[in-house]
Amino acid sequence: MRNTTFLVLNVMLLVSVALFCAADPEMEKSSFAEILDTGNPEQERKCLAEAADCSPWSGDSCCKPYLCSCIFFYPCSCRPKGW
């Protein structure tokens, strides 16, 4: 039983590392800290004017004064802060 649990946890860890490494190529263009601080300007251009849509990489700048809310990255939508 211990071996099975250990194997399952190792597989889950490997899959999560593989998904992280295969992240969107847009992320390689700037440092992660810069994206967290300022948002990715290339993604911000893709925001809808009425701020009904956002992406996990654009941050809340698309949604002002709302927050960008995502369920497992997609679909993302702008929602009031209380949600």
Swiss-Prot record:
Top-level lineage group: Eukaryota
Propeptide residues per the UniProt entry: 24-45
UniProt note on tissues of expression: Expressed by the venom gland.
Signal peptide annotation: 1-23
Note: Exists in two forms, due to cis-trans isomerization at Pro-75.
Comment field on protein domains: The presence of a 'disulfide through disulfide knot' structurally defines this protein as a knottin.
Function, as annotated: Inhibits sodium channels (Nav) of insects.
This protein's name: U2-hexatoxin-Hi1a
Organism, as annotated: Hadronyche infensa (Fraser island funnel-web spider)
